[in-house]
Amino acid sequence: MEQRIVCWFSCGAASAVATKLAIAENAGRLPLVVARCIVREEHDDNERFAADCERWLGVPITNLINAKYDGSIYKVFHKESYISGVYGAPCTRLLKKEVRHKFEKMTDRHVFGYCAEEQGRWDNFLDANNINAVSPLIERGLEHSDCLAMVRDSGIELPMMYLLNYKHNNCRGCCKATGPGYWNKVRVDFPDYFSRMANESRRLGVKIIRIGGDRVFLDELEPGTGNYQDEPEIQCGIFCEMAKHELEAA
């Protein structure tokens, strides 16, 4: 079976840059697929960002979805009666990991957008997954701020979640987040999503928020508490410049 390269595009800046680097490095030698797992609760602007990236990458994006749950975290919560906890988040497992497993082939070489500051997470991922996988960003010492800058410098407007000063382009109200500052920001930016998660977590008895050593329900969170990080710093360092030159020379 012929090997192919599968770049996992998540509508985040890191996965976009990792995919761009992988395409340049491959230079058409092996079949290459850019795959995206659809999650309904991500920001609608992701469709615009994906279309912009598709033109930048020069490769069509293959959209994948878990039809059983229509790609929705809330349908996962409803059917699984579980949001998150010691066993992780079922939405990640069912809407992303399971979809990836169904799509992948034994001979695939996978490309992921782990950044240089995520070396520990990358090592854990490799330990937990018996697959042929590479991280172009770690190989080049590229951090998340470098990726934000490279996307911006390519002329593509960053996804709305970044422009709203979120650290990553996750769902509007990520169930894996436990910080009061994060959820109070979601309360302001996406009140409907805050209320929906508050209702669902109360229904399932899940205390999402962590304050000190205590857990509290989302609907018990006092407005204004917590401190979420300000706007991400967007600047291109030396490794970023080296990677940009690599792309320009490709």
What are these regions (language model features)?
Residues 1-250:
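Nucleotide-activated chemistry modules centered on ATP-dependent adenylation/adenylyltransferase
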